[in-house]
From Swiss-Prot:
Biased composition (Pro residues): 311-321
Family: Belongs to the LZTS2 family.
Function (record text): Negative regulator of katanin-mediated microtubule severing and release from the centrosome. Required for central spindle formation and the completion of cytokinesis. May negatively regulate axonal outgrowth by preventing the formation of microtubule bundles that are necessary for transport within the elongating axon. Negative regulator of the Wnt signaling pathway. Represses beta-catenin-mediated transcriptional activation by promoting the nuclear exclusion of beta-catenin.
Bias type Gly residues, positions: 284-295
One Pfam family named in its UniProt record: Fez1
Residue segments, region Disordered: 1-131, 149-324
Low complexity compositional bias, start-end: 187-199, 242-283, 296-310
InterPro entries the UniProt entry points to: LZTS (IPR045329), LZTS2 (IPR028597)
Species: Mus musculus (Mouse)
Protein's name according to its UniProt entry: Leucine zipper putative tumor suppressor 2
Gene: Lzts2
Record keyword Phosphoprotein present: yes
Coiled-coil intervals, chain numbering: 329-651
Region feature (Sufficient for interaction with KATNB1 and for inhibition of katanin-mediated microtubule severing): 452-671
């Protein structure tokens, strides 16, 4: 339902539209992308006025080279001040419906496009590719959405011009609303234009849909719009009776209404220059066509001005001319294009809202991810730095140890060098000191060599004398060996005699022991014999009379019996005593004989012992004499050697002190 109010046209344009281009040109679909409000707020309402100049203005604090400032993606639009005393036009949003996504587009594409288009005011950042289309269009700065609303089929009948414009009046701009009033004049022109537009509409729509799949108009559409003739209407402005009031028509230089519609959010619009130029060109073209068809006295019917009522068509007007039909067909095509553009705007709104949400979420997620990445990289860098620091500390410690060890080695080498230098100095000093001593020693060696040659000659003579003395010593040794042999024989004989005497002494001791035993036994036998004599004397007494009948007599008779038995045994004891006495006498005689023999042997052994002792004394005397003779021979040999040396020295004519040199002194001076 479109409610049209009368709006006075201001003589001076608003400040916001002062910088708008005065010569509108047909723009592409991509130039019609407008700034969208943030999703989740009130329902967006379209503002069909001239766009403000701040479309690509850089917002303060929005993406200043980084992601530190987190500001809202779509800042609040300040409301515009309403002009007092003006009426407004309400446009029904019939075409603002949910458009399904294109099959060729990805689910994430609208969100990416919305997030990117929300920041068209500043330099857009590089988005991370999430779909195939974004990867293909990464080289482009501006990512254009491709989600379009499909074109609705048009009826095949020939409705009237108000019925044709009724369901589409909500998606048209203010200038197009005025065209609706202008085409409500003659019935023949509206019916013929409706039939011609209905016949040509499918072909035009299909051609436009096939020629503009990427959001831009085709070359043929641009040529057709740019080649339209410019007509100027010279009559009065037609007015249309409507329930909302009176709407004046527009001249060729005015185009669309500059005032904002009621219910549309005031403030600077976010649409670009292409969209404003397209709306202006459409409005001016509609004004020209309306002026050429109707003239100064045309009036629109109340049913066609409302646009929303399905009233029966008025009586057929007279048939218009060919030029009017052509203008009607073109006007119908333009309305279809505007409706499709409105659908595209709605789809752009939805896609941009999704892209805005995605980009906002990604913008909020980017600092966190960047912070996490930076923290991880910082942690890794810290770990690497710590490992490198530990490695450097270990290397520094090793180098310090090596340096300390090298310093110790260097100090030790310096000490060794000093010691070697001192030793070299000592050796040089000793060499300088030993030089003259070496010369003296060489002279002394020469002198000693002469003395040695002389001594060698004397030694030869002494050796000859020693050979002679040696032969004498050999003869003496032979005599000594013979004397030793005789001495050994005599010693053997003396040793045999000593052994025999020792054996005799042992036998003598054994005999003396046996004699002592016999004496003890004889003493014992004497005592026993005395005892037996005493018993025998007791037995010689008269026998006791026989016992009486008294019991005491019986006891005495027993004792008498014992005495009689003992008297019988006494005779046998006497015989045994006599025999023992005889044996004792024999033993005494044999002991005397053995004593005599032992005494004779002892005397003989004593004589032999004395003889051996005399022989040993004589042998010792001979040894002593031989030792004395050897000493005398040695003294004589030494005396002869001294005399020989003195004689040789006298022959050589040496000093008198020369004979004092002896062998011991020569050996003492040996080098």
């Amino acid at each position: 339902m479109a409610i049209v109010h009368t709006l006075p046209v201001p003589l001076e344009p608003a400040r916001e539209t002062a910088t708008a281009p005065k010569t509108p040109a047909m723009g592409s679909v991509s130039s019609l992308i407008s700034g969208r409000p943030c999703p989740g707020g009130p329902a967006p309402q379209r503002h069909h006025g001239v766009p403000g100049p701040t479309f690509f203005r850089q917002q303060d604090g929005l993406l200043p080279g980084g992601y530190e400032a987190q500001e809202p993606l779509c800042p609040a639009v300040p409301p515009r001040k309403a002009v007092p005393g003006n009426s407004f036009t309400y446009v029904n949003e019939d075409f603002r419906t949910e458009s399904p996504p294109s099959p060729s587009s990805d689910v994430e594409d609208p969100r990416e496009h919305q997030a990117h288009n929300a920041h068209l005011r500043g330099p857009p950042p590089k988005l991370i590719p999430v779909s195939g289309k974004l990867e293909k269009n990464m080289e482009k700065i501006l990512i254009r959405p491709t989600a379009f609303k499909p074109v609705l089929p048009k009826p095949r009948g020939a409705p009237s011009l108000p019925g044709f414009l009724g369901p589409r009046a909500a998606g048209l701009s203010g200038s197009q609303g005025s065209l609706t009033q202008l085409f409500g004049g003659p019935a023949s022109s509206s019916s013929s234009s409706s039939s011609s537009s209905a016949a040509d509409k499918p072909l035009a729509l299909s051609g436009w849909a096939s020629g503009c799949p990427s959001g831009t108009l085709s070359d043929s559409g641009r040529n057709s719009l740019s080649s339209l003739p410019t007509y100027s209407t010279g009559g009065a402005e037609p007015t249309t009776n409507s329930p909302g009031g009176h709407l004046p028509s527009h001249g060729p230089g005015r185009g669309a209404l500059p005032g904002p519609a009621r219910g549309v959010p005031t403030g600077p619009s976010h649409s670009d220059s292409g969209r404003s130029s397209s709306s202006k060109s459409t409005g001016s073209l509609g004004g020209r066509v309306a002026g050429g068809l109707l003239g100064s006295g045309a009036r629109a019917s109340p049913g066609s001005s409302s646009g929303g009522d399905r009233s029966p068509p008025p009586p057929p007007p007279p048939p218009p001319s060919d030029e009017a039909l052509l203008h009607c067909v073109l006007e119908g095509k333009l309305r279809d294009r505007e409706a499709e553009l409105q659908q595209l705007r709605d789809s752009m709104d939805e896609s941009e809202a999704t892209v805005c949400q995605a980009f906002g979420a990604r913008q909020r997620r980017w600092p966190r991810e960047r912070g996490e990445d930076c923290a991880a990289q910082a942690q890794q860098a810290t770990q690497r730095v710590q490992r490198a620091q530990q490695l450097l500390q270990l290397q520094v410690f090793q180098l310090q140890q090596e340096k300390r060890q090298l310093q110790d080695d260097f100090a030790q080498l310096l000490q060794e060098r000093e010691q070697l230098e001192r030793r070299c100095a000592t050796f040089e000093r000793e060499q300088r000191e030993l030089g003259p001593r070496l010369e003296e020693t060489k002279w002394e060696v020469c002198q000693k060599s002469g003395e040695i040659s002389l001594l060698k000659q004397q030694l030869k003579e002494s050796q000859a004398e020693l050979v002679q003395k040696g032969s004498e010593l050999v003869a003496l040794r032979v005599a000594l060996r013979e004397a030793r042999a005789t001495l050994r024989v005599s010693e053997g004989r003396a040793r045999g005699l000593q052994e025999a005497a020792r054996a005799r002494e042992q036998e003598l001791e054994a005999c003396s022991q046996e004699l002592q035993r016999y004496r003890q036994e004889a003493e014992r036998l004497r005592e026993k014999a005395g005892h037996l004599d005493a018993e025998a004397s007791g037995l010689r007494d008269p026998p006791v009379p026989p016992a009486t009948t008294d019991p005491f007599l019986l006891a005495e008779s027993d004792e008498a019996k014992v005495q009689r038995a003992a008297a019988g045994a006494g005779g046998s004891l006497r015989a045994q005593v006599e025999r023992l006495r005889q044996e004792l006498q024999r033993e005494q005689r044999r002991g005397d004989e053995q004593r005599d023999s032992f005494e004779g042997e002892r005397l003989a052994w004593q004589a032999e012992k004395e003889q051996v002792i005399r022989y040993q004394k004589q042998l010792q005397h001979n040894y002593i004499q031989m030792y004395r003779r050897n000493r005398q021979l040695e003294q004589e040999l030494q005396q002869l050697s001294l005399e020989l040396e003195a004689r040789e020295l006298a022959d050589l004519g040496l000093a008198e002190s020369a004979p004092c040199i002896c062998l011991e002194e020569i050996t003492a001076t040996e080098i």
